[in-house]
Structures are given as C-alpha cells and as structure tokens.
Design a protein with these regions (language model features):
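Hydrophobic/aromatic packing residues within the alpha-helices of TPR/SEL1-like helical repeat arrays
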Residues: 437-438, 471, 504, 538
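Interfacial juxtamembrane loops and adjacent helix segments
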Residues: 139, 269-311
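Alpha-helical transmembrane segments of multi-pass inner-membrane proteins
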Residues: 8-11, 15-21, 37-47, 68-75, ...
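Transmembrane signal-anchor hairpin modules in multi-pass inner-membrane enzymes, especially those
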Residues: 1-76, 80-120, 169-183, 215-225, ...
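Flexible juxtamembrane loops connecting transmembrane helices in multi-pass membrane enzymes
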Residues: 144-145, 203, 210, 226-263, ...
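TPR alpha-solenoid repeat register
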Residues: 450, 483-484, 517, 551
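Conserved structural position within tetratricopeptide repeats
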Residues: 442, 472-476, 506-509, 543
C-alpha cells in the first residue's frame, strides 16, 4: 500500500506543474519542476532497490532514445541558430521520461491512477475557466477565458481531452449507482459547456473526431449524415474565422516549401522562424500576385509534423510517427482511455502548438512512459544479467537524471535571473545600459524582444554595425520584418543606400501585406535624390491595400501624397 501511495504522490507532484500558470519564457515553475523530476527519480530508484524490481527495455524506449540522440546531435553539429532553450526543454523532458520509467518499473501503477490524475487536472481547469467567466478576469485582456494559459487556444485542449476521456470512460467502465457515479457520468457536460466558449476550431475538431472514433459503432448507419454534418460544421467554422484559417494555410504552404529545400535532415534545431521568413521572401518575390492579406508574423508552424519537418527533416518526422504509432497501438490494447486522450492531443497538434506548452509536454511524456511500461513487449529482458537489470541499469539511469537535473537547474536559474534583469531595464531605452545588455546577451540570444531593443539602443548611440549584428541575430529567431527595416535604417544612416534598399525590399518580401517597408523605401529614394523611384514608390504606397487600416497607415499614405504633390509643384516650376 505504501508503494502505491508513494507512486500516486510522485505522479501527482509531476502533474501539479501542468496546472501552473504558463509563461512565455523561463520562470520559477521550471526551476521547481526540474527539482521535482530529480526527486521522483531518486524515490523511484530507492523503491526499485528496496523491492528488488527489474527494469526492462521496450521498443518505445529505443525510439525515444534515438529521437533524443538525433535532436542533440543535430543541434551540436549545426549551431547556426540559437536553440539553447529548446535543448534544455528536450533534456528536461527526457529526464522526466526516464524518471517515470523508473517509477513505473518499481511499482505496477494502475491505469486508473494515471487517468484520474489527468482528469483531476482537467477538472481544475474547468473550475478555473468558469471562475474567470463569472468574475470577469483572465490572463489575457482580449479573452474572457484562458485557464492557466495566456490565451484560450491551448486552454481548450484540456477541455477537449477531458471530454473525450470521460466519454470513453462512460463507455468502457461500469460506474455503478450512487451520488459519486452520477456526478462522474455528467462530467462530459462540464467540458462540453465550456469548450465552445474558447472559440477554438482545432479543439472542436479534435473532440469531434475523437468522439466519432469512440462511438463509431453507434453511428455507422448514420455515417453519411454524420460526414455531411462535419462538412457543414467545418465550413461554418472556416467562415467564422476566415482570416485566421487563411493565415495558417499560408504558414502550411511555406513550411512545406522549407521542408522541400532540406528534406532529409531539416534546416536545424530552432531554425523555423528564420526559414519561414526566407521561404516567404522567396515565394512572395516569385509570386507577387498571390493573396498575402492573411499572412502574419508567426513563431511556429501550427502543425507539429511541419514544425518537426522544417527543423529535423524527414528523419525527425519518421521518428515522431513511429513513436506515436507504437504508443497508440500499445494504448489501444491496454488502456483506450489514455489512448483517446493522446489521440485528441495529437489531432489538435495538427492545427496548433500544444507541444510547445509545458502542461501538454508533461501529459504526453507521462502517457508515453506509461505505454512503454509493458513487460510483454520488453526487449533483451531474458538476456540481461539479473544484477545489471536490478542494480547497475537503475543506478546509471538515476545518476544520469540527477546530473541532467543539476545542469538544467543551473541553466534555468541563470536564464530566469537574466529575464528578470531584462524586464527591469526593458522600458528604458538608454545607451547607459549597453554594457548590461552585452552581459545578458549569452543568455538572451533567443529572445527576439531583447535583441530588437538592444539593436535600437546601439543605433541610438551611433553604433550602426553593432546594431545590425544584433538584428541579424534576431532574424535567426524571429520572422518579424522590422528586423530588416531597422537594418535598412542603419545602412541609410551610414550612407550605404544599396544595402538599405535591399534590406527594405527583404522586409517587404518577408511580409508582403505590410506598408511600412514600402514607406521607408520611398523616404530612402527621397534622401538619395532618386526622384523617379521616389514618385513610383509613393504611388505604390498610396494604392497599397493594407491588412489593417489605422491612423498610422493613413499617416504614411498622407506623407506619400505630400511627396507627390511637392514633386508636381517642382515640375511646374
């Protein structure tokens, strides 16, 4: 009994971090999470020693190890892009996986414990979201419901997962009679009521597909009506948020083009934003009549397969597909409830970015580690020496987790401190902070806001080459065209007009629905004294159909009109 309680406490401790407030950058939660992983691995190792249990190697373990080794090797061989944060997270998740494998090997944890632990987290998010709607507060001023997240998109995954898990549970398990079973039987309604409030099409679609699979036998005779209903619903959802859907279609198209350029090994870990900007620039210059109205700055592919394909190539995609397939097959045999939850999460990841959020990384690793814990599918289990399986292998794995945790803990603490220092001086753009920015640079090289602000401060101090160096570094981590616009400004200040012109044109090609790069080109031609190009660009600015009409864009067009009128007056004279 005590081992079961210990296992439940360890699982609960890990899952507690899936309901903590999610932040964009490193925070204290990540520090505590790393400490918890280390603690769980030590506890699991002691339980293994005390109970004299043996660990075994499964096929899932091999795929996980191969994928981890490939990512680490890929990042080591090609260090072009700042990817330290990504690698730290990968190491953290690998440490979590090994810790959970040790835990599940030390004691046979019931599937119900894992299921109810995840459901408790989902129910907590339901109460949190309902409280936000009732009391009118959330973590984003534009949305009424966000849960522990910064927007309702990722939050909706908890609701869709909770919905499909409870529906699968009602179908498979006999809950009995009484107050508690009755309450459990109505749990799907709690998730179903809040899910539409998130306005997440990906969550609705993933829930609908998962529920269709769960109840496939019941609706076989109505399948054509069901397909027709799905088509109608998808069409309605598309037109409700057409701009967003069109924008993601552009992201998918450019991502596929990026994969085609480096199909086998990908462009490198952490390369997506830069490759997306380069791909967009090439595509827009070759197809200028394409409708780019819905294009926008993005930091991910909104599709985990495409994200992996761009950075890791077909090798990464194959490892991901094999791992997912093996896990789903294993869960289908042993525990369909967890398999349904993972399937819902995977479907959602085809349209969004749940695997970039710590809560879903934790849940995914937990489910995969549980699926790998099947003695029937163990590899080399009879050939390993008993002493090795009982003592040496657990000791090596636990030591590796502890060493990884110490390294990760130190790195995250330094980055949390650097983020705190940057926030204190981010609102003050003064050249007195240049030395402080240089001191933080090694830890903040993947923070595009830090690099952009640093570049502006250097430019204000007249250090244009240093500013451009920071902007080039920023363009490796962001596809924001402003990194190229500021480079053009710096080149213009130094009198390098050809380089400035190239930078402005690159900025426009990266985001062809932005007016500002064309406006800067117009001013550059005016500064050069190139009247013909200036007038042509002014006319282009005036006729430009911008994505969002605002006082700023009206001001830019007004300036272009003034330039044209001034040129006409000069010609009359």
């Amino acid at each position: 009994m005590r081992y079961q309680v210990t296992s439940v406490l360890c699982i609960g401790l890990i899952l507690c971090f899936s309901i903590q407030p999610v932040e964009i950058y490193w925070c204290d939660v990540d520090i505590r999470f790393t400490e918890s992983i280390c603690g769980v691995s030590v506890v699991a190792f002691l339980m293994l020693m005390w109970r004299r249990q043996r660990i075994f190697l499964s096929a899932i373990d091999i795929i996980v190890a191969l994928w981890f080794a490939y990512v680490m090797l890929r990042a080591y061989i090609d260090s072009t892009y700042p990817c330290a944060n990504y690698i730290l997270r990968v190491m953290q998740m690998m440490s979590l996986y090994v810790s959970l494998r040790l835990l599940f090997s030390s004691f046979q944890v019931s599937e119900k414990i894992v299921i109810f632990a995840i459901l408790i987290c989902a129910i907590y998010e339901v109460f949190l979201g309902a409280d936000q709607m009732i009391n009118g507060y959330s973590r984003h001023y534009l949305f009424t419901i966000t849960g522990s997240f910064l927007n309702p998109g990722p939050y909706s995954v908890f609701l869709s997962m909770g919905l499909v898990m409870t529906c699968q549970m009602k179908k498979e398990l006999y809950l009995g009679k009484g107050v508690v079973p009755s309450l459990v039987s109505y749990l799907p309604l709690a998730f179903l009521i809040l899910l539409p409030a998130t306005w997440s099409r990906a969550a609705l679609l993933s829930a609908a597909i998962s529920l269709g699979i769960i109840y496939r036998n019941q609706w076989k005779r109505w399948r054509w009506w069901g397909f027709a209903g799905i088509v109608i619903i998808v069409t309605v959802l598309y037109f409700l948020k057409q701009g967003s859907a069109d924008g993601r279609s552009i992201i998918y198209l450019i991502s596929l083009l990026c994969i085609s350029h480096t199909p086998i090994f990908g462009s490198g870990i952490g390369s997506f934003c830069h490759q997306y900007a380069e791909g967009m620039a090439n595509f827009s210059s070759n197809y200028p009549t394409f409708n780019f109205a819905s294009a926008d700055v993005t930091f991910n592919a909104y599709n985990c397969l495409l994200q992996i394909g761009v950075e890791q190539g077909l090798i990464g995609i194959c490892l991901f597909v094999v791992l997912v397939s093996m896990t789903l097959i294993k869960l289908r045999k042993n525990t369909k409830i967890l398999g349904t939850a993972l399937l819902c999460l995977l479907i959602f990841s085809m349209f969004s970015y749940p695997f970039e959020q710590l809560p879903y990384q934790i849940i995914c690793v937990l489910i995969v580690a549980y699926a790998a814990n099947d003695v029937a599918d163990s590899i080399f289990s009879t050939k390993w020496h008993i002493f090795c399986r009982c003592y040496i292998a657990p000791a090596v794995l636990c030591s590796a987790v502890v060493l990884f945790s110490i390294f990760i803990h130190k790195q995250i603490r330094e980055r949390v401190r650097a983020e705190s220092d940057y926030r204190m001086m981010a609102g003050v753009s003064h050249t007195a902070f240049i030395d402080d920015y240089y001191e933080l640079l090694p830890l903040m090289a993947s923070n595009e806001h830090f690099l952009f602000n640093f570049a502006k401060i250097l430019a204000a101090d007249g250090r244009y080459n240093d500013s451009n160096a920071m902007l080039r570094l920023g363009s490796l981590t962001s596809c924001d065209p402003m990194f190229y616009v500021i480079q053009g400004n710096n080149y213009g200040e130094m009198g390098f007009y050809k380089e400035a012109e190239a930078a402005y044109k690159k900025a426009f090609n990266v985001m062809p629905n932005r007016l500002y790069p064309l406006y800067q080109l117009m001013l550059l031609y005016e500064k050069e004294g190139n009247t013909k190009e200036m007038v042509d660009m002014a006319k282009r600015v005036i006729s430009f159909d911008e994505k969002v009409v605002s006082p700023a864009t009206k001001g830019l067009k007004k300036k272009a009109i003034i330039i044209i009128n001034r040129n006409k007056q000069k010609n009359r004279k």
